[in-house]
A protein has these predicted regions:
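Transmembrane helix-loop boundary segments of multi-pass membrane transporters
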Residues: 41-44, 60, 111-124, 140-157, ...
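Structural signature of hydrophobic alpha-helical transmembrane segments
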Residues: 17-19, 48-55, 117-129, 176-190, ...
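Positively charged, small/polar-rich N-terminal and surface patches that mediate targeting and assembly
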Residues: 508-568
């Protein structure tokens, strides 16, 4: 529902999430670089626009994308047409990825520094096809109910195996492209599709089965792009037409243009990113399902809010953070202390992740369907910590040298080990968190930092060493989120309904004791906390599974109940 209170709450949270970015920029600019940026006013205005745009974007998600995505999934599940679900999954994956802005940036950079071997359009097609294929695999897993870690571990083995065949120039790029395929708009819709299917199909759990599609969308491009690299480096000769790396980096973040044409061009770019999603939804809703969308007016308003909010969000970033972040990265490489570079990389990773719109949306959904067992703010902190560690470690690799494959293999080993330790409900969310963290805000800043470091440090190759930071930013959140799950499980954190659950044996003994001792209050320990219930009631209502009906009946009689009514 559209209401002012919801928007104001989202606005408050948006500016709270931007605070870490502001503090990081101010600290490094004033304390380390010791200069006041020339464009500080535009940066300030840009941050304000980012905050408002983020709030509008999130409101649009809640009103438009989440409801229609979950509704479509439910309709397909009720229809029982697996073929149409699979086709819909592929179209959503392919159609939303091919126009992804972050993918456009990385593909253009790769084409520019590969001596013409890599074609930007072909690379985008390869990645888009791999994401469509990934969503199909993820939907098939939900339908069949197979545990996600079987697929993920197999995927990791294939990724590592592919590195032994692909040229070293393509490995870092392939790992990075696994992180840029999930956009700010795609992530919520894909998550809604998975959660909607898992909520509708009998025997599926939305927490255990609903998440995971984003993880597949991050994994498969690494495999497909490496095989594409084998082809281009085997059969395509390098051309003499190549843009210098330093020039290419600068041109990816031009000074923001306030002209009407530039503003309209930016808005058109966002519309192009969102319209394919809307087109796919309308086609399947009206042509395949032959069913009108409920609350169509609200859904269209929601999509309009997503477009306006995302456009404002990007304008705000271009006005301040993009150019400032790249300038600071170049200034820091001239500093004698590598520790400052690592600290800046980690701080940028943490602050941009906390402001990532798609992470906020997914964290809210995780809290909702986990009955509050997963705290959305703490989940975001865990993800941001993982990104921070990953980017700092990635910067360390660029500065000191080293093969990215060894770092990635060790990271995968940690992920696999934690998969068998962490509670089941957190594993799909942890896998998804790796893809959620690298989209609108993070990718341009992190890519610029990596290529800037590789360009300015002697002995480094921008194509081999410059890419890879996004891969680190995608890998380590999986580790920190699983660790968060282990900690919450050890602490005995319960969901809202679990907190109120009363075990039958404890209820029976407590009521019997109260009756025999003439007590006015009954004490039940239940879930480790002492609950007190006033004995001023004529009936007790207990919710139990069907198989426990006889046990509940016996417990009530032993407690002295004069009658028992069972409602199923």
């Amino acid at each position: 529902m559209l209401n002012l209170a919801s928007f104001l709450q989202l606005l408050k949270e948006s500016f709270r999430d931007l605070l870490p970015i502001i503090l990081v920029i101010m600290f490094f600019q004033l304390a380390i670089i010791q200069t006041v940026p020339e464009n500080w006013l535009s940066t300030t205005i840009g941050l304000a626009i980012v905050g408002v745009g983020l709030a509008v974007f999130l409101l649009g998600l809640e009103v438009g994308i989440f409801p229609v995505g979950e509704g479509l999934a439910a309709d397909f599940a009720h229809k029982g047409s697996t073929g149409w679900i699979i086709l819909f999954a592929f179209m959503i994956g392919f159609g939303t990825t091919v126009a992804e802005p972050a993918l456009l940036v990385i593909a253009d950079k790769a084409a520019g520094i590969s001596s013409g071997r890599i074609d930007a359009f072909t690379l985008r097609m390869v990645v888009a096809f791999s994401v469509g294929f990934a969503i199909v695999i993820g939907v098939w897993r939900i339908i069949k109910g197979t545990p996600i870690h079987y697929y993920i571990i197999t995927g990791y083995i294939l990724v590592v195996a592919a590195t032994y065949f692909s040229p070293k120039e393509i490995v870092g790029l392939a790992f990075d492209l696994g992180g840029v395929t999930t956009s700010t708009v795609t992530v919520p819709l894909v998550a809604a599709l998975g959660i909607g299917l898992a909520s509708t199909i009998k025997g599926r759990n939305p927490v255990l089965d609903g998440f995971g599609l984003i993880a597949f969308a991050s994994l498969t491009p690494m495999i497909f792009v490496q095989f594409y690299g084998v082809y281009v480096y085997q059969f395509i000769e390098a051309s003499d037409i190549v843009m210098p790396v330093a020039q290419h980096i600068v041109e990816t973040a031009p000074a923001f243009n306030f002209s009407l044409i530039a503003l309209l061009k930016g808005l058109l770019g966002v519309i192009v990113d969102v319209v394919p999603i809307l087109g796919v939804i309308l086609f399947f809703q009206y042509i395949i399902l032959k069913k009108p969308i409920e609350n169509l007016k609200e859904v269209l308003i929601g999509f309009a809010l997503v477009i306006v909010g995302l456009d404002a969000f990007i304008i705000g970033l271009e006005m301040g953070l993009f150019s400032l972040g790249e300038t600071m990265a170049q200034q820091l490489t001239q500093n004698d202390s590598n520790v400052i570079i690592y600290t800046f990389a980690g701080a940028i990773g943490f602050s941009t992740t906390m402001a990532e719109p798609s992470l906020t949306a997914i964290a809210r959904k995780a809290k909702e369907i986990s009955d509050g067992k997963i705290n959305d703010f703490v989940l975001r902190l865990a993800v941001a910590l993982g990104v921070s560690i990953g980017i700092a470690l990635g910067a360390f690799r660029i500065v000191n040298g080293g093969d990215i494959v060894y770092y990635i293999i060790v990271g995968y080993m940690f992920v696999i080990a934690l998969t068998f330790i962490a509670p089941k409900y957190i594993i799909p969310i942890a896998y998804d968190s790796g893809g959620v963290t690298t989209s609108t805000v993070t990718v341009p800043l992190v890519a610029a930092l990596g290529l800037g470091l590789a360009t300015n440090i002697p002995g480094r190759d921008p194509l081999i060493d410059g890419f890879g930071l996004i891969a680190f930013a995608s890998l380590f959140p999986m580790i920190t989120v699983m660790a968060y799950g282990v900690i919450t499980e050890r602490m005995g954190v319960k969901g809202e309904h679990e907190k109120e659950e009363i075990h039958l044996d404890e209820l029976r003994h407590a009521l019997a004791d109260a009756e025999n001792m003439g007590l006015s209050t009954v004490h039940v320990h239940g879930t480790g906390k002492r609950h007190s219930y006033e004995m001023q009631f004529s009936a007790v209502h207990v919710i139990v599974p069907h198989e426990k009906e006889e046990a509940a009946l016996l417990a009530a009689k032993e407690a002295g109940a004069r009658g028992v009514t069972i409602m199923s």
